[in-house]
Structure formats: structure tokens, C-alpha cells
Amino acid sequence: MPPKFDPNEIKVVYLRCTGGEVGATSALAPKIGPLGLSPKKVGDDIAKATGDWKGLRITVKLTIQNRQAQIEVVPSASALIIKALKEPPRDRKKQKNIKHSGNITFDEIVNIARQMRHRSLARELSGTIKEILGTAQSVGCNVDGRHPHDIIDDINSGAVECPAS
């Protein structure tokens, strides 16, 4: 027989889902069913919480305590960059492997780096900024009209100043 369910125990479940959509509740069921939650209700709550991230793949952190689920959106660097591009949401079923050919400012990159700082492995903010610039390169957008890798080279050579914190 399984151990008795402790009401004060906190369980954390991470899920990848598309923002603003009720994902497949069948994928939720094996993860949160044993914890005494209704997958359908949690799926609707996730869709509500991720409304701002329509059409983007994001990670959702479910903190479950005493049969209550708290939903926290944990956006990836690429999701933050694509959101900063302010492109209209696309139907992801029609188009696959989209290149985002937009342009964002270096200040927005710094803001994204500050948001991601706690999850970054870099020692300083300049390292995190370089990580975000690398992600911007993979997404396919430009920064201040230039290729992101050129800006990384400028940071390394000292031509571009990074904020200290």
C-alpha cells in the first residue's frame, strides 16, 4: 500500500506547454492525478495563466500543496525574446520552424538578461547578456539592427559597455 498522503507536503511539477491553450489533459493526468487534482481543471487554469504568452512554448511550474495548485510561468530566454519582438501570434499548426526576422534594442536584451539572471550560470551580468544575445541569434532576430554575434564581439573587446547589475 502506498504511504499516507501528507497534506502539508509540497510537490513541484514542471510542464512544457503552449501559452493560452488548454494542452492535452491526457499528458497532465499521470503527473497530477495521483496528487488528487483534476487534470481538466488544472489545464484550464494553466491556459488562463499563460494567456499573455499566446502561441509560445513555455515552461509552467505547478506547486501543489494540500490539493491546491499554484501556477507560475517560467519563460525561457527564447520566449522572452520572441515576446519582446511583439510579433502577432501565429497559428503554430500551419507554420513550423519560423525564423523571427525582427529587431530588438540592446536595452531590451539587458532587461531580459536581468529577468534570467537567477537561472544563468554566468558569473556576471555581462555573461548573462551574452547568453541572451546567443539565444537571439538562434531565434534569428537582430539587435539594434546588427547581428547579435557582432555585439558579443564588441562586448568581449570592450567597445560596448554592459551594466554592472
Curated annotation (Swiss-Prot):
Keyword Ubl conjugation annotated: yes
Any one Gene Ontology BP term: cytoplasmic translation
Modifications made to the protein after synthesis: Ubiquitinated at Lys-48 and Lys-83 by RNF14 and RNF25 in response to ribosome collisions (ribosome stalling).
InterPro entries reported for this sequence: Ribosomal_uL11, Ribosomal_uL11_C, Ribosomal_uL11_C_sf, Ribosomal_uL11_CS, Ribosomal_uL11_N, Ribosomal_uL11_N_sf
Residue numbers of Phosphoserine PTMs: 38, 165
Superkingdom of origin organism: Eukaryota
GO cellular component: a single term: cytosol
Cystine connections: none
Position of the Glycyl lysine isopeptide (Lys-Gly) (interchain with G-Cter in ubiquitin) cross-link: 48, 83
Keywords: Acetylation, Cytoplasm, Isopeptide bond, Phosphoprotein, Ribonucleoprotein, Ribosomal protein, RNA-binding, Ubl conjugation
GO MF entries: large ribosomal subunit rRNA binding; RNA binding; structural constituent of ribosome
Modified residues annotated as N6-acetyllysine in this record: 54
Keyword Transferase carried by entry: no
Annotated compartments: Cytoplasm
Matches recorded under Pfam families: Ribosomal_L11, Ribosomal_L11_N
SUPFAM superfamilies to which the protein is assigned, alphabetical: Ribosomal L11/L12e N-terminal domain, Ribosomal protein L11, C-terminal domain
Sequence position, cross-link Glycyl lysine isopeptide (Lys-Gly) (interchain with G-Cter in SUMO2): 40
Quaternary structure and interacting proteins, as annotated: Component of the large ribosomal subunit. Mature ribosomes consist of a small (40S) and a large (60S) subunit. The 40S subunit contains about 33 different proteins and 1 molecule of RNA (18S). The 60S subunit contains about 49 different proteins and 3 molecules of RNA (28S, 5.8S and 5S).
Record family assignment: Belongs to the universal ribosomal protein uL11 family.
Biological role stated in the UniProt entry: Component of the large ribosomal subunit. The ribosome is a large ribonucleoprotein complex responsible for the synthesis of proteins in the cell. Binds directly to 26S ribosomal RNA.
PANTHER family: 60S RIBOSOMAL PROTEIN L12, LARGE RIBOSOMAL SUBUNIT PROTEIN UL11
Descriptive protein name: Large ribosomal subunit protein uL11
Organism in which the protein naturally occurs: Homo sapiens (Human)
Gene it is expressed from: RPL12
